A protein has these predicted regions:
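Membrane-embedded alpha-helical segments that form the functional core of polytopic membrane enzymes
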Residues: 6-65, 82, 98-108, 233
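Hydrophobic, membrane-inserted alpha-helices
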Residues: 18-24, 80-84, 215-223
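Membrane-spanning helices that line or support transport/gating and their immediate boundary helices
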Residues: 50, 54, 58, 114-126
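Juxtamembrane helix-capping/reentrant segments at transmembrane boundaries
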Residues: 56, 60-74, 132-136
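C-terminal membrane-associated helical module and adjoining short loops/tails
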Residues: 121-260
Length: 260
């Protein structure tokens, strides 16, 4: 429907940022009508996020900056939500300590989203090089950043380089596995290894799905509708970080099995 209109995927992403950022304002109010509107806005923002990906595939308008902007959009949505919760709770309880929980939740979310994105992209890479084309090594990202001209795109790619660096530092056994496989097979990893990796990786997806947009927002919506928004901070900081730790330990153990 949007093909031929001149609307680009990045335009859709920018619209989703503004729609999602409004959710924090809706959740600030201790009012069921506002809260339901906030839930609907967040769902709509996520639909827009899906639309920009579909539009990119249909039009062939794809770029690394578009992917970075896409991830940045989700961070803005949730940052606005954490701030909205903090303002609401500080108003209700007369203390600003909830902003500390907002910061901890935001940092937790960034790390969780970072690692989750890495694992899911890696899984696609082991399906095929085409489906996993977005999976890049740190060296590839650094080389791309170095050759870019100064400007806003280079700045976004600088952030992406740090984003990738965190992924690499957090997954040492995974990096050893990739180095080992590429040393043996180059880019032509045998199909039996790909299938075996996907089979084991798929078992971890039930944990990883808890850290995705759908996984976390289902819990968030229930908490928002009950009015006990402070509970989401605890869920984000305690429960989801425990889930992340379990996933990372299991994933590293899985990768170690391919080093033999």
């Amino acid at each position: 429907m949007l093909r031929g209109t001149g609307i680009t995927p990045n335009m859709i992403t920018v619209i989703s940022i503004f729609v999602g950022a409004a959710v924090g304002f809706m959740f600030y109010h201790d009012n069921l009508t506002y809260n339901i509107c906030g839930i609907l806005l967040l769902v709509f923002a996520n639909i827009l996020d899906c639309v920009d990906g579909q539009l990119a595939r249909l039009t062939g308008i794809k770029s690394a900056i578009g992917r970075i902007l896409d991830g940045f959009a989700g961070d803005i949505w949730f940052a606005s939500i954490y701030i909205g919760f903090a303002l609401r709770l500080s108003h209700d309880y007369g203390t600003d300590w909830f902003f500390a929980l907002a910061v901890l939740s935001g940092l937790s979310h960034l790390v969780q989203a970072n690692i989750t994105d890495y694992y899911k992209t890696l899984h696609l890479y082991f399906i095929s090089k085409d489906k996993g084309s977005e999976f890049q090594s740190l060296e590839q990202v650094e080389a791309k950043h170095k050759e870019m001209k100064y400007g806003i795109n280079k700045f976004f790619y600088f952030l992406y380089r740090w984003y990738t660096m965190l992924q690499v530092k957090a997954t040492p056994t995974l990096q050893s596995m990739l180095q080992n496989l590429h040393a043996k097979y180059g880019d032509n990893i045998p199909e039996n290894i790909r299938v075996d990796f996907r089979k084991q990786s798929r078992h971890l997806m039930r944990y990883i799905d808890l850290l995705t947009f759908n996984g976390r927002t289902m819990v968030m919506f229930v908490i928002v509708l009950t009015g006990q928004v402070w509970a989401y901070y605890l869920y984000e900081i305690i429960v989801l970080n425990i889930v992340l730790a379990i996933v990372m330990r299991k994933h590293e153990k899985m990768c170690a099995s391919f080093l033999g």
